[in-house]
Amino acid sequence: MSLRRERTLILALLLILAAASWVMLIWQSSTTNGMGMGMGAALFLAIWVVMMIAMMFPTAAPMMLVFARVQRDRRSGGYAFVPMWVFIGAYLLIWTLFGALVYLGALFAEELAQQVPWIMMNAARIGGGIFVLAGLYQLTPLKRVCLAKCCMPLDFILTSWRDGYPGAFHMGLEHGIYCLGCCWLLFVLLFPLGIMNIAAMALLTALIFVE
């Protein structure tokens, strides 16, 4: 298969996965009361992973394409081939672990809100404060470092390359951490907006993609 056809196929598969995930999220939001904390951890994490595929795969596609390109070139040179799913699996693992922290944090916040009426009375102010924090974080050195790593796929591959299955898994973890460093506070914004708010998710996806 030619390089161009291979790249087109990989990109098409990534976008199909993202599109299918969006369809699932829209269906989920229309058939339930949303992604409330009343659901179990397993269901929450399953929906969370679908969210990450829908929102992050379009942005992460350039990195995955570069990884596949380098793997193809190395295979031609006689090196062992490692499938891209190893890299993607590690990348999604980082977001899944973050989702678990989000779930635990939401349970704690819900319990605290029931015990402290002030929180519910000032929910709008707290939500506004989260927006301010998200805006300020965009200006921090940590944000700039993480964004630089995510915006230069070839540079990341050249400086972070590791051989074999463990190496690809490590690279996926590393790239996932940088992506998380870029976007974690933006995802926290979904709480005041509604975790299953499709319009908010689409807007955040567009912001992340443009960034």
Residue spans for each PLM region:
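Structural signal for membrane-spanning alpha-helices in multi-pass inner-membrane proteins
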Residues: 21-25, 135-138, 208-211
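Juxtamembrane transmembrane-helix termini in multi-pass membrane transport proteins
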Residues: 45-92
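Alpha-helical transmembrane segments of helical membrane proteins, especially in multi-pass transport
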Residues: 137-145, 167-195
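Transmembrane alpha-helix/helix-exit interface in multi-pass inner-membrane proteins
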Residues: 96-111, 123-152
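A small-residue-rich subset of transmembrane alpha-helices
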Residues: 77-108, 181-211
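Histidine-/acidic- and/or cysteine-rich, low-complexity loops and terminal segments associated
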Residues: 1-50, 72-76, 110, 114-119, ...
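Residue-level signature of transmembrane alpha-helical entry/exit and packing/kink sites
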Residues: 10-14, 40-44, 83, 87, ...
